[in-house]
């Protein structure tokens, strides 16, 4: 269950960061009169509607796994911000529609920045609410006072020192991943040589600059964790296994630094090459995996310090259901891989400036 949770969350985070970063970058590029900038804006916008489907579909499995693993805590925190939590559905629907309008207006040569900006603000709101819930579930000491203040869940929690750095980390990570995404696009055969150079230059510089902010936010988020959590990540807990989560944090640091170096080489050197394109993809995925492993350790150790032991439970496994899930999951990945191969073999359409 844990491995499935970590795997699906990692994929979900990759899609989320692509959406958050790619959308605002598309908005900013659309404001320029540079033909290559407009080409980049349209290229990102056309892909964002697809990215949004992955954000939603890859977000459901980890939420269900989290409900099984942390049900009492997550259910309680969700009820305490119930008004905001249920509003996420409507906000996502509106964001999805705005993404299509943003793309359509760009393709028609109309001003679209304001549509994209509204969509980005709505996506950021959802990210904020999710961060709020994921941190509120770790704070049972405030649940009673919040319920007393509003039984219908009309208030958001305050006084959490970890919320701001965690949210900033996700937002900065969006631009970091968005820059790496541009590096990948610069290696696609569907763009002109001029567009490739522009994407490599801009994507590399954005990823390098925002990667530094991402690092700083990550160090800040780690620094505000309670002493018991830090000790647990160092292997000083009832479960030494969480030492691996602490080690994942150091691997995350190394991977982000490596990505910043690669991005700087490609961005400032205007390097367009297959190795930079695919290295960007590999580093982006590995960075998110390490982040998720570290994050999981922080969550479990925080709850453990408050007498919620995720491992202390009676497990009655329904192997038939587990087997069906694994078959469908692997089959779904196979179908996605086949669809990707079909797209890769299809005749390429140049995405030049309009």
Which residues does each predicted region cover?
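Membrane-interface interhelical loops and short amphipathic "cap" helices
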Residues: 1-9, 36-40, 64-83, 136-166, ...
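Alpha-helical transmembrane segments and their helix-start/interface "positive-inside/aromatic belt" motifs
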Residues: 5-8, 38-50, 105-126, 197-208, ...
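Hydrophobic cores of alpha-helical transmembrane segments in multi-pass inner/ER membrane proteins
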Residues: 15-27, 86-101, 168-185, 249-265, ...
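Membrane-interface helix-loop-helix modules in multi-pass inner-membrane proteins
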Residues: 50-119, 216-258, 323
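Membrane-interface capping segments at transmembrane-helix boundaries
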Residues: 101-105, 268-269, 335-353
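Aromatic-anchored segments of alpha-helical transmembrane domains
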Residues: 121-129, 210-219, 280-294
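Loop-centered beta-sheet repeat module
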Residues: 151-202
